[in-house]
Amino acid sequence: LQAWYLRSFNGSKRTFLNANGNGNDEQSFSNIANVFGIGAKYQIGESAVLTLDYGQNRSKFGRYMNGNTVYDHERGTADFTVKGHQMGGTPHFWMARLDIGRADIDVPKSWNAFIDYKYFAHGSFLGGNGTGAVPDRYLDGIRSFTFGAGYVPRKDLLLEAFYTFDAKGTNKRDTLYGNESFKLGDYARIQRTYRF
């Protein structure tokens, strides 16, 4: 069981302008992250592990990113009047992952396999995921499944494959024609790691 906290400090002030009628609304932020998280890891037998994580970004910037643009739109026309920005709720994330085996680069013929589910509300993910399985784009405002496997055919060589599917937006995103739901395509990655 673990708990953690991440906070940005001494950051420069960032200002965002949002159109509102004929003018702009201004939002300024100096604290990007104020993240609280908890996690648990449970060993199942000798070779399986279940991992669960949950967290929230409680900064004003996180709520801003989780919000959306407000439009005045007459149905059946292409006319939109932008009416500013609406703050969203506190963005949160959670993930569940099941790992079986352990691909150890020092142990030939060792292997691993995993499946996970991820949910990251827009504004909860701050970049740099450390997974190797998916790019950052598949973690910001997205929910998805990933499965993967690794195999060590000989010492110092690790082969891995990952497949992310059913990646969908957790909320509507701003587009030129108002807020729209979206879905990303599936994502596959194969990689080889050799240790010299």
Question: What are the residue ranges of the model-derived segments?
Answer:
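Alpha-helical scaffold segments of alpha-solenoid architecture
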Residues: 1-2
